[in-house]
Amino acid sequence: VDIKALRLKATLFALPKVFALKAKGSPQFRAFLEQKACVVQIRLADGSIARHYAFDRGRIVSRKGLHPSPDVVMQFKDVDTAVALTTPPINYAEVIHAGKNFRVALMGDEDLIAWFTQLASRLDSDGWKMGEPMPDGSTRYTQMTNGGPLHVYVKDGRIVRTAIIEFTKDDPETWTMEARGKRFTPRRKAYVAPHSLAMKSIVYSEDRLLYPMKRVDFDPDGERNPQNRGTSGYERISWDEALDIVSKEILRQKQVHGPGAIALAHPSHHQWGNVGYYLSAMMRFGNTVGVTRVMLNPDSWEGWYWGAMHHYGNSMRLGAAAGYGGLEDALKEAELIVYWSSDPESQFGAYGGTEASERRLWAKELGIEAIHINPHYSPTAAFTGGKWLPIRPGTDTALALSLMYVWIQEDLYDRHFVENRSTGFDEWKAYVMGETDGVPKTPEWQEEETGIPAREARALARLWGRKKVYLGCGVNGGGFGGACRNASGIQWARAMVMLMAMQGWGRPGVNFGNLTNGTPVNLEFYFPGYGEGGISGELMATGSATNNYVRMPHLLSMNPVPQIVPRQKLPEAILEGFAEGYLLEPTSMEIQFRPYFYPAPGCSKIHMLYRYGGSSMGTIASSARFAEMYRSPELECVVAQGIWNEGETRFADIILPACTQFERHDIGEWSNSSGFGYHWQAQLNHRVIAMQHKCIEPLGESKSDYQIFWDICKRLGLGNYYSEGCSELDWAKRVFDSSDLPKHISWKKFLRKGYYVVPPEKPETRVAVDMRWFYEGRPKDLPEPFPLPAGYSHKWLHGLQTQSGKFEFVPNSLKRLQPERPDRPALMRYTRPFEGAREGERYRRYPIQLLTPHQRFSFHTAQDGKGSAISDLADHRVCVDGHYYWIVRIAEDDARRRGIAHHQLVRVFNDLGSVICAAEVTNRLAAGVAHSYESSASYQPLGEPGASPDIGGCMNILTPNRMQADGTVASAGSLCLVEIEAWLGTSTLQEAAE
């Protein structure tokens, strides 16, 4: 007797009874069962075992044998395969292996295939209980946002409030740190960023896209009228019509134009979650369809990636410092923290919320001094106190050179590091001392450049040279955001690492950090970050190969289209037909030297743009170019898949309404980006992994991004390939199972409670301090899998990722770049920024330097506009005559000379365009400098898009599209020259320019 055959027959025979029993006890399952009428055939390939099932709106009739015309066929190669794949629990490694080797096949109507596979999956998942009942009749769910985890309270199908998570006695103990005779323990709460607490308001925004829409003068079978994009109205259409138009257009583009005709574009970030994130569901969709990839530049790491990296490596961190062990080292050893273009109280370490604020208070309590080098007296400076040096924007490198001059002149540098751990110092020293060019980089020399008095520069150099100093650069203290994003960002980042090298980078109390990073959380507990690609199956453009692809078996996906275009140059690609870019690829320092060109040989130019996610008009330099691009006849079809009617959505031909993360299932960990930011959880006081519950049903007819992609793929015959038969909840379970969570908490308990706190590292096994190993000449002892083994020039774990294995004051990698680039030479030289105060005629026309740093109250554009609660914050927008205007901060002297009053409407303009803002007159800026955060979600031109003043607040209309250096795509978009005047009501770019 063939036991396996009998077992398979019994399973197939029992299946209708199992469905019926489940339907009897689960109204949700019964409703799903009643959706379809179809015949499903399950069989072996040779037909020796076969059974078919006739589903009729809830009724099931099952018969032995083959049906003459089934709607769906599930066919197994043999009995062994069938038994393995139908016996719970499902082993996805076996499922994927069988599918890839054609041992199992699903054939028939894609929509019915999806329904049947989900019916089988729901036998288990429809019994899962989620959330916790509250005394007031609400249910408490959890969510993970870009700024941290939330409790979400839902009653009668609506979100009534959100709140931070307060940990209980059931959660692990919190770590304690001892420093200088004191003990410090962080509060047992998850302190999120302000924008996280605004999420409820944007879920119910009046600007939500609730129905599929088509531009009224767009006819996919006739006149498309691209010139009217941005001004035409829209009409509501059904999902079937919308999906039919999009899927047919995808096929038409491929058939008429060939590979590369479809481009897939997205913002830097979107909604949180390992399943729904752009590197996950969207990446899988793009690979499934075949698209020209619009490649991001390292837009928050620019100077570090294109510059600092070449001195010491860390390419897998895009040139930024790691920060391991930095908190304890700083509290115990540091005497001074220099916040150089670093405002962590505004940018929250990117994802870390306000977790680090109390740590900066600890430093203050311990008497650690603070100095702030920033054109703006930032919220961090106001919070921590200390000396403020209001440097002229773009001239930071000059100040850094003068510090090094004093250190050399007065022997205030770490000779041990310079002589034993570095190369090229003599050549660098000759430049600093003026032997190379005849210009000694004295404090007096820098005063003319920076506006910092020579006596203060010299005093800073001496103070720094005699103390143990932590240098905080950018958002998280180790290189991310800040001055690396302006015209001299490459110089600045290179200067910062050379400052650190001269002071003995890695010795006790000397490192990068602003107390945002380096907490003693357990970093070895595995949970995949969003950078690992989620469900994408993409191995090259994500960090999936590191852990995720092995830990969570799923189908590999590959994009067969070799064409890419740099995001910053997408308008030029469309309008001019050509673009050149350089790779964002972290595996080595040299890959960035390799150019790529659009159009790629053998590929079509772009004729269809599929845009996913939130607005980018407020985050990309010279963004008015995009308005012109969207109206080009070269783009035959523009699809926008988004949540709100904002930014680029208004230029689309077809709008597909996506729901928020509160309306779908997902799973994610706070501040865990993994592939793009290894161990960023070390900026948190507690590692928190959350089930992202589907708190409410999608509003209107909106759908999850995953469901939209799946629905399109069904129409292309690729639905089962895209989904692997899984819903978002199924995928979340697979992510859970791939992690270390099952060793500590059951899936059912995790679903109910909604989160898990990873126990902290024991004091005895806390991670080592970053670069200590290098300073002391030991093998590397940090828990990061890079450089890659071949990246070492000495034995594995010995030395840095450079040719010499040492810190290189004159990088060999840049020496090998031939011919030498004058704006990125191997021997770094100070040059004035092209958007600086010495720009000649341009500076006379536009005499104010405008800073546009990362947003404080919104995560990029995600929480801005659209009726968000943060609009009511007086430091974010100002309501004038019923409209919420973006804020530009202007120095008191500049405002007085121009007759501008506090909160008066002003026009900020240059030859690229104009933006109408509300003026905030302040004494926190020096004369000649203005400040306005980037990342407005609203783009509201008063007239023709791209050629009229914007009242939405897109300050990046004014920023230059010029790269920091030739041979890079290093954006210089955080600094520009403008003029500011009282708003006169002009409505065209020509009038504004005049």
Indicate residue ranges for each PLM-predicted region:
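N-terminal export/assembly segments and adjacent metallocofactor-ligating motifs
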Residues: D126-L412, E538-T542, N547, M552, ...
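Glycine/threonine-rich phosphate-binding loop and adjacent beta-strand/alpha-helix elements that clamp
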Residues: F662-P698, C713, V810
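Feature captures hydrophobic
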Residues: V1-G127
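Extended redox/cofactor-interaction regions of prokaryotic respiratory oxidoreductases
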Residues: Y278-I373, A398-L401, V497-R650, T660, ...
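N-terminal leader/propeptide and maturation segments of large enzyme subunits in energy/redox metabolism
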Residues: L197-E241, I245, P259, G273, ...
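Long, contiguous, secondary-structure-rich segments that constitute the structural scaffold
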Residues: K182-P194, I689-P760, T861-E994
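Acidic, Ser/Thr-rich peripheral helices and adjacent loops at domain boundaries
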Residues: I391, Y526-G537, I655-Q681, T922, ...
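Short acidic-glycine loop/turn motifs at beta-strand connectors
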Residues: D46, A54-R59, Y153-I159, T384, ...
